[in-house]
Design a protein with these regions (language model features):
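N-terminal cap/lid segment of alpha/beta-hydrolase-fold proteins
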Residues: 7-50
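Gly/Ser-rich "nucleophile elbow"/oxyanion-hole loop immediately N-terminal to the catalytic nucleophile
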Residues: 100-142
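Hydrolase active-site cap/lid region
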Residues: 149-194, 250
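Short alpha-helix in the alpha/beta-hydrolase fold that links the catalytic acid
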Residues: 217, 231-240
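Acidic catalytic loop of the alpha/beta-hydrolase fold
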Residues: 225-230, 257-258
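C-terminal catalytic histidine-bearing segment of alpha/beta-hydrolase fold enzymes
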Residues: 236-276
Length: 276
């Protein structure tokens, strides 16, 4: 975090008129993050003067940006973060091997920078004149769920969070329960001449279960009981270390895309409403 703080963010807002109206304006945002990396995101900001709550959305692995109706959530600032190398930041033809990049050392592993990007998103949202910094929230699915947990663990400015199907939890068991991302990570570690012990040592610095006891805000989590990508066992490895007010919702027939379950958006909205 000290290294991140030493990097001037150099926020740049680029208007997206085709996605704006007289209710909210849309912007593509660019900023500098850990290591001087340029990252970006999509911002919707109310046109009317005032102070507004803000919602940060952390994206799933390899997801594309999706554009909202600017008239939806007229009383909310919304920011969708694109972490390094993904979405807006992905180069044409770039492989989606991020989970294995830099595995040979904790200082070079991809998620070191990505977790810092998650905190930089909070920096950005809190820098906006219209943000009520006492009402900043976050949510995300899969990789975005992991980033939501990481952000709240590393930064106490978040008021409440709602991750679903969180990724990157309990690696030793995770790699037994699911083939991906274990297979490409293990292959990269082998190529780097690492033992399993060395690999898991590096990964322990980025295991979400080792972060969540630092969370200071309320949490609601959604899981899919049939999830083969981020199995419930791994979700609860992170959840069980949370010491604050917390709750979870299980969708027994859902696989990985639990965030698409009909009841989750309503449950999430009701949860955040308590803290608005």
């Amino acid at each position: 975090l000290q290294e991140l703080a030493s990097v001037a963010p150099e926020y740049k807002l680029i208007p997206l008129k085709e996605h704006s109206n007289d209710v909210r304006e849309a912007f593509r945002v660019e900023m500098k993050s850990f290591g001087g990396e340029t990252i970006s995101g999509l911002l919707y900001m109310p046109v009317a003067e005032g102070k507004y709550p803000a919602m940060i959305s952390y994206m799933g692995y390899g997801s594309d940006v999706w554009y909202a109706d600017p008239s939806s959530n007229p009383q909310m600032i919304e920011f969708m973060l694109c972490i390094r190398n993904q979405a807006f930041n992905r180069q044409p033809g770039e492989k989606d091997d991020w989970c294995a990049r830099g595995i040979s050392d904790k200082n070079t592993y991809y998620y070191r920078g990505a977790f810092a990007d998650a905190v930089r998103a909070i920096d950005f949202v809190c820098s906006l004149d219209k943000t009520d910094t006492d009402r900043v929230f976050a949510s995300g699915e899969s990789q975005g769920g992991a980033l939501t947990f990481a952000a709240a663990s590393l930064d106490d400015r978040l008021k409440a969070i709602a991750p679903s199907a969180p990724f990157l939890c309990d690696y030793p068991d995770y790699f037994v329960l699911a083939g991906w991302p274990g297979d490409p990570i293990k292959a990269a570690a082998k190529e780097a001449g690492m033992s399993d012990e060395d690999m898991y040592k590096v990964l322990s610095y980025f295991d979400i279960k080792n972060f969540t006891d630092r969370i200071q805000c309320p949490v609601i989590m959604a899981i899919g009981l049939q999830d083969p990508v981020c199995p419930p066992h791994t979700n609860f490895a992170a959840y069980n270390h949370i010491k604050t007010e917390k709750s979870w919702i299980c969708y027994p027939l859902s696989g990985h895309n639990v965030w698409q379950q009909e009841g989750w958006p309503v449950a999430k909205e009701d949860f955040f409403e308590k803290y608005l």
